Each structure stands twice: as C-alpha cells, then as structure tokens.
C-alpha cells in the first residue's frame, strides 16, 4: 500500500461513519438515543442514553399509522418500472423483514415479562405494539402493491414469501431466538437468560441485521426513485427500531455495570450469534464464497456498516 493511502477496510469504515451521520439527520432518529448515531462521542464510549421513562415518552411522541400511507405509485413501480430479475432480488430483503417482524412480535412477550423492573416492562409493552404495526405495514404493502399475486391474508402471504429466505435466517430466528425465549418463558426469574435474550434480540437481530437492511433498502429506493409509500413507511419502521435498540443498549449497559456475570452473558451471546447473523445478511441467490451486490451495496460495504453500528453500541456498554 502506498504511503498516505487508506486500506480498503479503513475506507469502508470511513464510509460507514459518514453514512451513520447522514442517518442521524433524518427526522426523529437522533432523538432515539441510539449510540450508533451519536458519532465521535460513541466512538469514545460516551453517549447520551435515554432512561426507560424517557424512551416511553419518546414512543408517545413518535406515533404513526400504517393506514396513512399511499401505495398507489408503489404498485405502478413494482409492476411497470422494476424488472423481473430485480423484483426477484428485492424479495430477499422484503421477505426477511416481513417474516422477521412477525417472528420478533411473537417472541417479545416472555422477554418483556421477565425484565426486572416495571419501567422496563412498560417500555417493552410499547415495543410489542410497534412490532405488530410493522407486520401490518408489510402485509398492507404486499396486499395493495400485489407483491405476491394470488395470496389471501396475512398467514398466506407469510408462507408464500418464506421461500425467498436463506437457511441461516431460519437457524437464527426459529432456532436460536425461539429456544432462548422458550427457556425464558419457563424460567422468567433467570436474569442471565434475560440478558442473553436482549443481547440476541436488540443488539444482533435489530442492531446488526434490521438496521443494516433498512438503511440500504431505503437508500437504494430513494436513489432510483421507486416505492415512495414504502420508503415513507419503512423509514418510520427504522426510527422505531433505533428506539428499541436504544432500550437494549441502556438495559445492557446497566446490567454489565451491575454484575460481571451479565457482562459475560453478553459476550457469550455475541460470540454464539454473530457468525450466524453474518450469514443471514447474504442473499440466498449469491454463492457463499463470492462478493455480491444488493440494494446498491456490496457484501463488504454491507458487513462493514453492520460492524460499525455494533462497535459503537458495544463501546458504550463497555465491551469494546
């Protein structure tokens, strides 16, 4: 490498930092308290974290309704402006979010009930409502745009879109997450299990996977000028997710400071889940050992963005 030049890895990290700065400028995003959006302060391990009551109050101020979205132009775009091959490639992202939102809606209840304080449980009650709204958002988009013609109803659409997922998705959501939540439902007094579940749910599934996908899907549609109703709604979904991740960061920061056992639980869960989450990001139509591009971003760019987001949050928690 020539003196004065940056390595590709350093360049991708710099791009990720710039991207996070632009996301923070979206309306209401910085207010969520997600450390990933707090720039150099988070890089130094310092961030302004909202407490659980403040997160609840923010939820009250950031309400939105799926019925207010207009998908008229989206239907035209999907059937007339987006070609067959691109529609097929886009289905990976759409399916992962549609089914992912349904899965996390179903799994959050036991986590909420097992949280130690009433303030934490109240906030997670709002998150259950958010996740259900996200499922309704995707169901309405699929229905009114005609994403899967011939399907009838939510359950039918979920079954039909599942074929576009990769194997790692099922292993993470239906295997690892479901088993952790089942354990928690049986032993709600196990605080270590709560810490593990929130690490997997909020740090990995929402923080690494969901927000990475949301960023690139929204940005690509804005760049090419497609699906304006979807972009509007998905932006609101992303804002909700940043608020959820801010809760997870607050919770794990508090728990890591309280007991070394909880720090170890966070680290153990990350070590177990991140290799699988890494595979979830790869589209099923791409070979495992090759680079790919989806929604205008390469494999390396996508993974670098996810890593930068996680790094900032872990520094604030005190683990990086």
Question: Language-model segments: which ranges?
Answer:
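Non-heme di-metal
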Residues: 2-320
């Amino acid at each position: 490498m020539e003196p004065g030049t940056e390595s590709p890895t350093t360049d991708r990290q710099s791009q990720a930092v710039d991207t996070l700065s632009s996301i923070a400028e979206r309306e209401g995003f910085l207010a969520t308290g997600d450390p990933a959006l707090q720039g150099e302060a988070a890089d130094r391990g310092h961030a302004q974290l909202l407490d659980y009551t403040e997160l609840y109050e923010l939820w009250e101020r950031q309400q939105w309704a799926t019925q207010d979205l207009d998908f008229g132009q989206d239907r035209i775009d999907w059937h007339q402006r987006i070609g067959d091959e691109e529609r097929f490639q886009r289905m990976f992202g759409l399916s992962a979010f549609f089914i992912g939102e349904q899965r996390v809606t179903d799994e959050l209840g036991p986590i909420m009930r097992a949280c130690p304080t009433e303030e934490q449980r109240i906030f997670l009650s709002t998150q259950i409502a958010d996740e259900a709204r996200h499922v309704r958002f995707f169901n309405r988009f699929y229905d009114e745009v005609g994403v899967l013609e011939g399907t009838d109803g939510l359950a039918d659409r979920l079954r039909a879109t599942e074929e576009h997922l990769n194997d790692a998705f099922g292993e993470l959501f239906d295997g690892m997450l479901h088993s952790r939540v089942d354990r928690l439902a049986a032993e709600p007094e196990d605080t270590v299990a709560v810490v593990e579940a929130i690490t997997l749910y909020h740090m990995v599934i929402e923080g690494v996977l969901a927000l990475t996908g949301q960023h690139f899907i929204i940005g690509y549609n804005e760049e090419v000028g497609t699906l304006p109703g979807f972009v509007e709604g998905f932006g609101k979904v992303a804002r909700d997710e940043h608020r959820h991740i801010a809760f997870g960061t607050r919770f794990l920061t508090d728990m890591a400071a309280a007991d070394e056992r909880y720090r170890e639980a966070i680290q153990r869960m990350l070590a177990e889940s991140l290799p699988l989450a890494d595979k979830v990001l790869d589209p099923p139509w791409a070979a495992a050992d090759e680079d790919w591009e989806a929604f205008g971003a390469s494999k390396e760019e996508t993974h670098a963005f996810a890593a930068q987001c996680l790094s900032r949050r872990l520094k604030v928690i005190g683990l990086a």
